[in-house]
């Protein structure tokens, strides 16, 4: 059997370009989430609007599930990812120019929904089967890490001391039009999207022939339902779909609960509460790497008890009121989540 280091050495360089593009795109998505929460609070919107941001973001994933796969397969994957990032930049720009954060973040979600099948599909085109577990470890680890780091960066950008320092920078003879904390944060987040788009341009061609697929929406819906039923009838497919659906659903909910919990239990403001989530990134990275190293596809279901343990530790967080105790527990939760979700 090949060692993990030998397998990693066989991964072509283009794979890391794909990972870099994915990292910066996901990083910007989640930094934008904090900027959107800040924008809602600045406009004194009802507090229940904040979790609705995630609902509006993921709406496209549900409504367009039957169509985004066909779109991703209709052209080279790098072009799909580039177009998707352009849509995200449009959503970020809408928020900058005063559109309601819920509407603007929904546009970003449209880009993310189109991006998702391309980022996974290109791996199967570009890498041999034996490298897919390692590749999935990278993509899940970097994605979750980008989620956490993006929230930290978003929280940092809205800190009064940091934001005022950044606003003090200016270009001679040029009026940038960036005058508020929100505009400054959105400008920097837009740069992250541009970096991701530049990486997309250097994603290697996989050599796969992209033929125009059927575009009839009724056919695509029928085909989607057929594939979905096949997955649910497969024993391992059932486990993978059920577990990952619950995992990401709970994770999206916890993203907002942790912020509110930090404000109530630890007396932290939005900036510090969002940065507290960053400590989870350490555990996520360790867990994802460990899963890629030790867990094969045949052994993937063996990680399910770790998901149960993770849930129990999340329950324990109800009784934590000190930051020195919260930090190691959040790192542990991150480690378990990274080790748990990669094989699934």
Regions found by a protein language model. Name each.
Residues 13-33, 53-72, 76-89, 104-161, ...:
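Substrate-agnostic recognition of the 12-TM MFS/MFS-like secondary transporter fold
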Residues 121, 125, 179-182, 186-216, ...:
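Helix-loop junctions on the cytosolic side of multi-pass membrane transporters
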Residues 12, 43-44, 74, 98, ...:
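Helix-loop interface residues and adjacent transmembrane-helix termini in multi-pass membrane transporters
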Residues 87-97, 195-199, 286, 312-316:
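Transmembrane-helix signature of multi-pass solute transporters
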Residues 34-44, 93-97, 149-189, 264-266, ...:
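Transmembrane alpha-helix termini and helix-breaking/packing motifs in multi-pass membrane transporters
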Residues 51-56, 60-70, 74, 78-80, ...:
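C-terminal transmembrane bundle of multi-pass solute transporters/carriers
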Residues 2-15, 205-242:
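Juxtamembrane intracellular "pre-TM" segments in multi-pass secondary transporters
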């Amino acid at each position: 059997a090949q060692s993990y280091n030998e397998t990693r050495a066989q991964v072509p360089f283009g794979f890391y370009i794909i990972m870099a593009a994915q990292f910066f795109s996901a990083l910007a998505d989640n930094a934008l989430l904090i900027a959107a929460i800040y924008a809602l609070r600045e406009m004194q919107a009802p507090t229940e609007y904040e979790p609705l941001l995630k609902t509006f973001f993921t709406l496209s994933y549900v409504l367009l599930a039957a169509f985004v796969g066909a779109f991703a397969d209709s052209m080279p994957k790098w072009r799909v990812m580039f177009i998707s990032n352009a849509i995200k930049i449009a959503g970020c720009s809408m928020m900058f120019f005063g559109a309601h954060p819920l509407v603007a973040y929904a546009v970003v979600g449209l880009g993310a929904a189109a991006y998702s099948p391309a980022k996974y599909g290109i791996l199967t085109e570009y890498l041999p089967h034996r490298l897919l577990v390692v590749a999935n470890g990278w993509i899940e680890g970097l994605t979750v890490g980008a989620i956490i780091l993006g929230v930290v960066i978003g929280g940092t950008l809205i800190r009064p001391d940091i934001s005022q320092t950044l606003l003090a920078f200016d270009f001679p003879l040029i009026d940038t039009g960036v005058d508020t904390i929100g505009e400054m944060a959105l400008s920097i987040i837009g740069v992250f999207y541009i970096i991701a788009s530049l990486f997309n341009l250097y994603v290697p061609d996989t050599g796969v022939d992209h033929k125009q697929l059927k575009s009839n929406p009724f056919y695509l819906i029928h085909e989607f339902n057929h594939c979905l039923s096949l997955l649910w009838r497969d024993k391992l497919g059932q486990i993978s779909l059920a577990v990952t659906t619950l995992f990401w659903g709970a994770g999206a909910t916890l993203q907002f609960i942790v912020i509110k919990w930090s404000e109530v239990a630890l007396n932290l403001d939005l900036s510090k509460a969002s940065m507290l989530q960053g400590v989870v990134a350490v555990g996520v990275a360790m867990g994802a790497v460990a899963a890629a190293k030790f867990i094969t596809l045949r052994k993937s279901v063996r990680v399910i008890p770790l998901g149960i343990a993770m849930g129990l530790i999340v329950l324990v967080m109800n009784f934590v009121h000190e930051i020195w105790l919260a930090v190691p527990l959040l790192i542990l939760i991150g480690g378990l989540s990274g080790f748990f979700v990669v094989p699934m």
